Amino acid sequence: MVCRELRNLLLAAALALAAPWAVAGPASSDEAVLGAYDGYREGDALKLARYAKRLEGHVLTPWLDYWRIAMRLEDTPTPEVRAFLDQHANTYVAELLRGDWLKVLGKHADWEEFERQLPLYPRDDLEVHCYAALMEAQRGEETSPADTAWMWLDPHELPDGCASLAQFMLDQERVTVTDVWRRVRVLFRNGQITAAKTTLGYLEKEDSPDERLLADAARQPKRVLDRLPRNLERRAVREVVVLAFLRYARADPEAAAKLLESHLAARLPESDVHYLWAYVAYEGAREHQPDALKWYARAAHEALDEDELAWKVRAALRAGNWRVVRDTIDLMPPMQRHESAWTYWYGRALAAQGEETGSRAYYLRIAGQTDFYGLLASEELGYVEAPPQSTYVPTEAEVDAARQNAGLQRALELIRLGLRTEGVKEWLFSVRYFDDAKLLAASELARRAEVWDRSIQAADRTVRTHNFALRYPLPFRDVFTEYAKTYNLDVAWVLGLVRQESRFISDARSNAGAAGLMQVMPRTARFVARKIGLRNYMHKGVTEIQTNVTLGTGYLRLVLDQLGHQVLASAAYNAGPSRARRWRDATRPLEGAIYTETIPFSETRDYVKKVMANSVFYAALVQKQMTPLKARLGVIAPRGTAEPAEPADPLPEDELP
């Protein structure tokens, strides 16, 4: 019943979105595609075949063929799979099926065919990598957890192929007790308790921890730490205490640091003490604890992983300690050190220490890039950007060539039919090797189809030749302008936020329930509707464009009134007003860029960077002026500063997109 209702909804959406450019037949063919898709999802081969019979020559024939063979791949003869791969060579569905087949081949140890297909599969797939390593190990290659750290230290439950590799290494006595506990620590740090218990199953009984003590470490870590076992010289007992500390430090880093300093450090080996100081400092930095740098100082540099190094830099930024910023970035591995964020902050650290020539050299590495730190670096060099000019407009011949591209046809058709996940993957595959001109032609094709997210994605990828009108489109411009004026909001900021929220997909829905152009949550929508006097509001209409923009801009106005700053309001729109307030410093004003870089949630940190950078370009396109990003970021006042009182009717916090 659910699948039938889903099919009907998808069909209705497809008919509503039908456009003259689309490669689509009559409604009956739309119904047949969705019916075939239902058959595939339900595992009903007869149903799939019945609908597929009506679709001979359809643009989505490769997908119909894929659905048919994928349903029975375990039992499909090798010649038939090879025939599919040859028939659909250089398509997304061929790559998809080859990945599926490699896992089947690995599962059945058909290494001859696996080795034949592996070079033809370019994707970075963890399970396929594991089967490749298992093949080599079974042929006598020396394979250990150190050789397969990319798998062994993955912070999730291992897929079947990786579990098989781990078991083989265990059977060959290539896994040590230290290897097992190293993986368990990674899993505990990431809350993967079930996977940690699975990994502990690799240990011999005499090396295994007490199950009750392990359960307490996961659920009641303070209890374990308050009643330290006497026999800490035993590895299994000591490791469980370390695990308990990891859980406790995540919840309360300040209390954990006091406990470590007062008595726990004296009971543990020096290497474990350094490891725990590094972790408690990391968690303290994420909570903006003022003592985080002191805790970092008690950990050996060698004990810090990439995340811990990044948060040491962030803690130093909040403390204004430019020497530690510079020294810590110097400790980063080369790939991390060359990321645009650390390139910019290294330049700032050099400037703060009077090394202006050196700082300019670092800014020049990323200046001209159109992202958050590229803009800031350009501004540090004194480059005041003029409103961006599109350097390339695709010709009609180029757009027509994009229209004839079979992969793009399939992508847009899948999206039109409501099969967005499949359509997006088809699109990404199709444009992956496009040069700038082809990317912009594909972007223009998607723009004409009003598939705004794909248009933006293609235009965003250009390297030398750009089209900012495609990269920063203005659908529904009049609606956004009207409501930005109604609520006295900067329309460039609103557009920058919507570009990040939904990519202008009017019927977008998140897994959390956020809906529409401005990704309004259900409870937030009801709250704002009541606040602004939107009468007879029904949530089923939340994706209607006028309604959604009314609610979204109304909420943005309420948040801005409470927090008084676009950076704070942007963070609040993504993660809630209370968090945005809490992330300010307790006593010191912070640069807006430092506040943004030190947001604890990586999703929100990235979100605010993109919203604020987007706003710069939308101001240029809509208002014909470039307000520097640094000016938009401004300064964030400390928590103790006088601000508007929190209303008696606080904004919703419990349903975040």
Regions from the language model: what does each represent?
Residues 57, 66, 90, 258, ...:
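Catalytic glycan-binding domains that act on GlcNAc-containing polysaccharides
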Residues 24-32, 43-44, 56-63, 75-76, ...:
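Generic helix N-cap/helix-start motif at coil->alpha-helix transitions
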Residues 48-52, 81-85, 98, 114-118, ...:
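Inward-facing hydrophobic residues that define packing positions of alpha-helical scaffold repeats
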Residues 68-70, 85-86, 98-103, 273-288, ...:
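Alpha-helical adaptor scaffolds
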Residues 42, 71, 75, 104, ...:
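Structural motif corresponding to the intra-repeat A-B loop/turn of tetratricopeptide repeats
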Residues 8-20:
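Bacterial N-terminal signal peptides
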